[in-house]
Amino acid sequence: MASETTEARAPFQPDGAYGWRCPEHSERPAELFCRRCGRCVCALCPVLGAHRGHPVGLAEEEAVRVQKLIQDCLECLATKKRQHADNIAHLEDAGERLKVYADSSKAWLTQKFTELRLLLDEEEVLAKKFIDKSTQLTLQVYREQAETCGKQIEVMDDFSTRVWGIGQEPNPVQLLQAYIATKTEMGQQMSPSELSHPVPLSFEPVKNFFKEFVEAIGNTLQTPMDTRLKENINCQLSNSSSTKPGALLKTSPSPERALFLKYARTPTLDPDTMHARLRLSPDGLTVRCSLLGRLGPRPAPRFDALRQVLGRDGFAAGRHYWEVDVQEAGVGWWVGAAYPSLRRRGASAAARLGCNRESWCVKRYDLEYWAFHDGQRSRLRPRRDPHRLGVFLDYEAGILAFYDVAGGMSHLHTFHAAFQEPLYPALRLWEGPISIPRLP
């Protein structure tokens, strides 16, 4: 049986070879093909042999038909292979688009939570101002009432002295005359006076309002996020489209600049940290490049190889916002913040802004924009070339965010870190000047 199978499957050989001979009638050539048995046979087999009555055809014609089937199979396999390759490409592209979309959604959330914190801070200030105003008005009423009582005491003391003098009069006639003159007033003074009981001023309505507000938020946040999103009709509508995973996260307008201006600062630059080939304006707000270095001793904090400069004052707590004008800075600029421990000597990564753990920055060079920290970089794709950057620092929250002010406060990048030292505004120049505008 194995021999027959081998013979049946063996390719056709030239005349005289074993593969051309009928396995049943070995003296005859196997010039036909039995379709039912799948074997090459001779002309006698379908008439007198074991393949009698079976459908047969010429072996050469069957070989042509099989070759066409093989070609069709190969073409089908190639098509399916291309389809699977296309599927892989589509999946990889969808994965990359999902990563970009996830990053933009997280940036959007960072922006929204920053706005929320700013709004809550503003609400806290308003609530405290309400308490202060109510307290001052009530204290003013208390003071006026106390002054009235004091004046009445003075009147009573004066009247007591007069009555006591009448009682000491030795002449009965004069005593009675004096008594008659003061009898009416004495009767008035002898009537019981009213007692003043200040009504306590209650701030419970304010406290209860914000207590219920916090409890409502807390109760909402106790529900798992996926449940909250399913229950939200807006999220359900957003989720109706299945073309993009994570479609629940929507891009919204940029935050209002006024929210940040409440924390506005105008940091001046420190000439002692400035590279020798940089020049600082008299107000300390504009720095530009110079062909010549400065003469005289080199201060220890000065950058000796990189055209960098730090702010004069650092921020070790709270929220701060400043802006940087880079419209004339040319093809390259670096804007960020740094610890005072940033290395000042040499041009190694330990001294370059954004290339170490001591500094963070947004960089532009030759139409490309990047965010740098500790040697790690993220590509930025602003909608337009930023001419003025807004820098927002929330020290306790560990947020350092950059915005395109002229582009409607569109978000550029946010760094998250547990800050360990004061942060100083930091700049690095390539060719043109960089300025820090005065903010209201």
Swiss-Prot record:
Mapped zinc finger ranges (B box-type): 17-59
One Pfam family from the record: zf-B_box
Name of this protein: Tripartite motif-containing protein 14
The gene coding this protein: Trim14
Keyword Ribonucleoprotein: no
Modification after translation (UniProt): Ubiquitinated. Undergoes 'Lys-63'-linked polyubiquitination; this modification allows IKBKG/NEMO recruitment to MAVS. Undergoes 'Lys-48'-linked polyubiquitination by RNF125; this modification mediates its degradation via the ubiquitin-proteasome pathway.
Domains as described in the record: The B-box zinc finger is responsible for inhibition of SPI1-mediated transcriptional activation.
Gene Ontology CC terms: mitochondrial outer membrane; phagocytic vesicle
Organism lineage: Eukaryota, Metazoa, Chordata, Craniata, Vertebrata
Disruption phenotype: Knockout mice have an impaired herpes simplex virus type 1 (HSV-1)-triggered antiviral responses and become highly susceptible to lethal HSV-1 infection. n addition, TRIM14-deficient mice are more resistant to inflammation compared to WT.
Family: Belongs to the TRIM/RBCC family.
Tissue specificity comment: Expressed with high level in spleen, thymus, liver and testis. Expressed with low level in the brain, kidney, and skeletal muscle. Expressed in various differentiation stages of B-lymphocytes.
Keywords, ordered alphabetically: Cytoplasmic vesicle, Immunity, Innate immunity, Membrane, Metal-binding, Mitochondrion, Mitochondrion outer membrane, Ubl conjugation, Zinc, Zinc-finger
